[in-house]
Every structure is written in structure tokens, then in C-alpha cells.
């Protein structure tokens, strides 16, 4: 499989996953122009569009893409029904597109109907889980978002996180501010600074590594709890998550 990240807007990524026959899926096309350019350059043949949630920077290019490819199915959660989705999918549903199997995972939090698409090893998770971070709570509750990222964290180690924004460096700066002595975070921040200075993407990233450098996946870490002056018992880890999210919102 060939995975391509297509930059869009200021910091979005539209994902394209193609097989050997150059049949591909397009994930969260916020705008159409860069997608059409990539399709033409690589001679890819789109088989489907996958939407994770209803925000315009993820669905804005759907109408024009459907103009160019009238028969293309557009999969998405119920909240995308008015944003171009032609096939509504729900948690636990399975899709087979261009010979690749996809499982739908409900991940409410950023929006109430947000979903992710998992096709081993690829995880298209929209604005739920970012490298070294997670999405803002624009509609859901902290409990929902914490449960969602924990659900994604249970996927296999080799899972490749294909999120929709280039937020890695800013997320690492926040993580370093919380855990300045953490060598994994400090080293990775330096690596990403060099990568981004060359305008190269920081994604995708393996879930196994993400568990080390993403503070939102480390809410049970005693050192982390001490740093944010939280002494939550194991059944209150959502309060640790909530405190981290609150601090990140104002960072």
C-alpha cells in the first residue's frame, strides 16, 4: 500500500491510501484542489471518500470531488449526512474498499459523532488523537474523549497514526513543559524541529512510540500526576486528562 499525506490549508493533512493498482481512498478532503493534483500526478483512481467528522476543514472538498467523480461513495458518521456523506457508517461497521478492510471505531469527544477508520496498520483518526496530543473538546465531554483515546491506545503497537493536523511540534513543547526531564519527549522534540524546518511531515507515527511521548496517553503515570499536582486514584484518571486538556487549551 502507498500512503500519501496531502498538505491542505495551514496545517491539515488529507490522506490518500492506494493499492498496487493505484485504486485509492481519500480521507477527510477539506479542499479538493490538492487532492485532484495528487490524483493526476500519480494517476490514482479514487474508490471512496472517508469522513471522520463534520467540520468544514475535513469535508469542504467533498462536493467538488463528487463533481469530478459522480459515482464515488462518501462514507461518514451521521453528523456528515448534510456535508456530503452518501453512506452512513456506525461503530463496529466493516468496509471493504479496493481490497482493503476498514473497521469503524466511534471516538466521540472532539465532536459527538466523530469516528475513526482502522485498516491494519493504518488508523485514520481525524481530530481525536494527534501525535503527542489530542483534539479539543468542542462537543463532547472529558469522559468521552478520554475513553475514545484509550480505545485507540489499545490497538496493536505497529498501528500507524494518521491524524489530520500537523500539531506535533506544538504538542511536544507542551509535553516538555509538563515533563522537562523526560528524555524521550526532549529528544523527539529536537527531531521534529529538524524535520519541520525542512517542511517535512511528522506523520504517520507508530502507536507504540506514541504511548511514550503523548502525555494524554500517560494519565496513569505517577510522575505526570505529581507534575500537575494531581493525586487521582486509578478510577479518576479522567480528572488527570481533564487537567492536561485544560492546560493545553491555554498553553
Swiss-Prot record:
Write the record's keywords in alphabetical order, separated by commas. Hydrolase, Metal-binding, Zinc
Q: What is its EC number?
A: 3.1.2.6
One Pfam family from the record: HAGH_C
This protein's cofactor list reads: Zn(2+)
Known catalysed reaction(s)?
Answer: an S-(2-hydroxyacyl)glutathione + H2O = a 2-hydroxy carboxylate + glutathione + H(+)
The entry marks the following residues as binding Zn(2+) 1, namely 53, 55, 110, 127
Task: Relay the cofactor remark from the entry.
Answer: Binds 2 Zn(2+) ions per subunit.
Known InterPro entries for this protein?
Clx_II_MBL, Glyoxalase_II_hydrolase, HAGH_C, Hydroxyacylglutathione_Hdrlase, Metallo-B-lactamas, RibonucZ/Hydroxyglut_hydro
Database matches in PANTHER family: HYDROXYACYLGLUTATHIONE HYDROLASE, HYDROXYACYLGLUTATHIONE HYDROLASE GLOB
Its annotated function is as follows: Thiolesterase that catalyzes the hydrolysis of S-D-lactoyl-glutathione to form glutathione and D-lactic acid.
Regarding protein family, the annotation reads:
Belongs to the metallo-beta-lactamase superfamily. Glyoxalase II family.
Self-association state and partner proteins as the record states = Monomer.
**What name does the UniProt record give this protein?**
Hydroxyacylglutathione hydrolase
Q: Which organism is it from?
A: Yersinia pestis (strain Pestoides F)
Amino acid at each position: 500500500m502507498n500512503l500519501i499525506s496531502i498538505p491542505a490549508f495551514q496545517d491539515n493533512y488529507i490522506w490518500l491510501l492506494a493499492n498496487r493498482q493505484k485504486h485509492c481512498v481519500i480521507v477527510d478532503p477539506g479542499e479538493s484542489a490538492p487532492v485532484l493534483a495528487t490524483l493526476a500526478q500519480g494517476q490514482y483512481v479514487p474508490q471512496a471518500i472517508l469522513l471522520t467528522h463534520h467540520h468544514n476543514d475535513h469535508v469542504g472538498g467533498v462536493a467538488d470531488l463528487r463533481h469530478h467523480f459522480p459515482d464515488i461513495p462518501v462514507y461518514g458518521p451521521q453528523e456528515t449526512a448534510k456535508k456530503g456523506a452518501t453512506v452512513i457508517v456506525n461503530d463496529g461497521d466493516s468496509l471493504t474498499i479496493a481490497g482493503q478492510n476498514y473497521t469503524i471505531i466511534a471516538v466521540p469527544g472532539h465532536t459527538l459523532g466523530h469516528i475513526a477508520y482502522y485498516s491494519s496498520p493504518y488508523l485514520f483518526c481525524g481530530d481525536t488523537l494527534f501525535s503527542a496530543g489530542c483534539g479539543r473538546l468542542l462537543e463532547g465531554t472529558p469522559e468521552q474523549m478520554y475513553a475514545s483515546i484509550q480505545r485507540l491506545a489499545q490497538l496493536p503497537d505497529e498501528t500507524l497514526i494518521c491524524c489530520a493536523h500537523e500539531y506535533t511540534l506544538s504538542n511536544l513543547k507542551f509535553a516538555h513543559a509538563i515533563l522537562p526531564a523526560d528524555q524521550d519527549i526532549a529528544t523527539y522534540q529536537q527531531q521534529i524541529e529538524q524535520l519541520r524546518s525542512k517542511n517535512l511531515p511528522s506523520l504517520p507515527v507508530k502507536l507504540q512510540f506514541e504511548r511514550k511521548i503523548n502525555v494524554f496517553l500517560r494519565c496513569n503515570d505517577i510522575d505526570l500526576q505529581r507534575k500537575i499536582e494531581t493525586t487521582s486514584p486509578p478510577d479518576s484518571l479522567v480528572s488527570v486528562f481533564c487537567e492536561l486538556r485544560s492546560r493545553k487549551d491555554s498553553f
